[in-house]
Amino acid sequence: MNVQVLDRYEIVKSLGSGGFGDTFLAKDTQIPSQKLVVIKRLKPANANSNTSTELIQKLFEKEASVLEDLGEHNSQIPKLYSYFSNDNEFYLVQEYIQGVSLNEIAPISSEQAKTILSSLLTTLKYIHSKGIIHRDIKPENIILRDSDHLPVLIDFGAVKETMGAVTLGSGSTVSSVVIGTRGFMAPEQSSGRSVFSTDLYALGLTIIYTLTKKLPVEFSSDQQTGQLDWQSHVSKIDSVLAKVINKAIEMEPSRRYSSAEAMYQALHSLISSGAEPALPMETVRVAPSNEFLVTRSSTKTAETVVKPVGNSHNNYSNNNGKSKIATLLTVLIGIIVVTAGLGGGFIITQQIKEAEARAAQAEKEKQEAEQKRIEAEQKIAENEKRQRELEQKRVEEERQRLAAEAERAKQERQRLAAERQRVQVLANQAKAMASGASATIGGIPGSKNIRSGPGTDYGVITQGYTGEGLDILDSSTDSSGHVWYKVYHYGSGSTGWIASQLVNF
């Protein structure tokens, strides 16, 4: 586009336009790397109102300084490099976050959604601790950064809200516009009464979008409670995540989580206790291990009966047949009992193994989620530590630079003073030679005392300066034997005494 802002930022392309202004991708041409930045150009929404530009300027600078502080101390909020105004337009120059928005990657899995939600809640905890409400959370305003895959929260609504400032007849200032995106705004937000749970409401709907790739208006809702029917659009929904989201998107603020911290704790406490219970197992009666043995040992042998000899063969045949049948039945019953016992035991064993496997998988997933959370928090802590170290290093380097600059300035002042004295001495000497003086004042450049008599006991009658002309009139010694000259001082026109070591012939 080859358009520049402040003769510094070269516009690369437009990133979007809205009711409050325009957003551009630009290059910072005044640094060697020509780093990419995002420039937001904002315009007052009520150009013809009674609200003064000075008031909007003041509100803009206040909110911009808050945004600068947030980005400086949290790596998941873009840094604010600069802010300024020009021709009744207001500019923010921010860090360019390279990555993809949640709008672009949807739909995602429940596990991915939980990780993103946990990380964003950590960021919101920090933002809310500063008394700030984002006001415009939606999929487009959350970027998964390429460098570390952490979700970055962009486009805070507070600065844009200042563009709608108007002054009431009572003298108080309010915003005449509502910041937010239709479908993601909580009911209280449309009336200008945003609270911390307003952000949680929008975050819940944003996570629903990442799971379904559907806007809130595309879901049917319960006519009595207003609850959205979104879970039927997710093929495999995590029950823990669903429970947390449903509470966050309650219509009444009092029914939602009171804070990002509360929602974060709910998400992780449910995950910690969220191992699926084993499915109810069918009760199967299994014979005790010794039942088959009891059945065999309790089988009665044929009873001995005395019969007439003539019928002995028939009796034997009948009894023997019955005994064989009884034995066969006993064996069959035993086999059936053992088989039933083995089958039932196999079913129970399988169900126990399956339950144990499910519990182990749930525990593994919980540990992985916790590990991801810890790693994300460690990265945040490392980034914050690195930022603090860089800031300390910058402050120390700046202190050393200022000290070195002060020392150079001091040396320069001393050099100039010495140079001035040297020039003055040369000038005095030239003047003395021109006047026909027989001698000049010598010694280190500066003033010298001319006294009323030969010695330091006498008072000072005037002062001469190195290089000024003298005429020698007489000489004498003081009480210590030091030689003094009585001189006529051309500079003052006075006659007095000066120590011999201060006279050059």
UniProtKB/Swiss-Prot annotation:
- EC class (word): transferase
Which EC numbers does the record give?
2.7.11.1
Residues in Protein kinase domain copies = 9-271
List of catalytic residues: D136
Q: Name one GO molecular function term.
A: ATP binding
Organism annotation:
Synechocystis sp. (strain ATCC 27184 / PCC 6803 / Kazusa)
User: What SMART domains does this protein's entry cite?
Assistant: S_TKc, SH3b
Pfam families under this entry?
Pkinase (PF00069), SH3_3 (PF08239)
Catalytic reaction equation(s): L-seryl-[protein] + ATP = O-phospho-L-seryl-[protein] + ADP + H(+); L-threonyl-[protein] + ATP = O-phospho-L-threonyl-[protein] + ADP + H(+)
**InterPro entries xrefs:** Kinase-like_dom_sf, Prot_kinase_dom, Protein_kinase_ATP_BS, Ser/Thr_kinase_AS, SH3-like_bac-type
Please name the Gene3D superfamilies in this protein's record: SH3 Domains, Transferase(Phosphotransferase) domain 1
Q: Which family does it belong to?
A: Belongs to the protein kinase superfamily. Ser/Thr protein kinase family.
Keywords attached to this Swiss-Prot or TrEMBL record, sorted alphabetically, are: ATP-binding, Kinase, Nucleotide-binding, Serine/threonine-protein kinase, Transferase
Query: Where do the annotations place ATP binding?
Result: L15, G16, S17, G18, G19, F20, G21, D22, T23, K40
Domain SH3b span(s) in chain numbering: 436-505
Origin superkingdom: Bacteria
What is the name of this protein?
Answer: Serine/threonine-protein kinase D
Q: Which residues form a coiled coil?
A: none
